[in-house]
């Protein structure tokens, strides 16, 4: 497996990976997740590809000529003055592995790549958001040394 930076030529396969990931999330937690429109995804990912720079990395994992995953990391802005959060250089990341390739070390390799990139850019702490229903990903993150540190809560509201 090789990991390389994304290029504009990767747009279509990145859209497919995003759709695959959206379907996975919608299946495990349909109250929260949906499968977005392909054109809207294209706009979002095109901006992401064009916006790469020193404050982030966006890569794909390749098995031969096949893209089997993608991952990105972005260095977060420091907390504003008066914020209770410690001003530790932090980066947030996300990983997607194509169904059928999950559980084979691709996600782990992508995360380790992002961690090296972040450390080389002065980052001291990595964070991510993961659905409670995504048990496989949570297991991997724990194996890699990530710990639960915060909780986001959700309550659907109904109109009277």
Name each region found by the language model.
Residues 2-16, 25:
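A short beta-loop-alpha structural element at the N-terminal edge
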Residues 23-46:
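Conserved GNAT-fold acetyl-CoA-binding loop/helix
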Residues 43-60:
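A short helix-loop-beta-strand connector motif used in the catalytic cores of GNAT acetyltransferases and
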Residues 60, 66-75:
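Conserved beta-strand in the GNAT
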Residues 75-80, 127-131, 135-138, 142, ...:
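Conserved catalytic-core motifs of GNAT/GCN5-like acyltransferases
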Residues 77-93, 102, 124:
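A conserved beta-turn-beta hairpin within the catalytic core of GNAT-like acetyltransferases
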Residues 94, 103-116, 120, 139-144:
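Conserved acetyl-CoA-binding loop-helix of GNAT-fold acetyltransferases
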Residues 118-129:
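Conserved GNAT acetyl-CoA-binding A-motif
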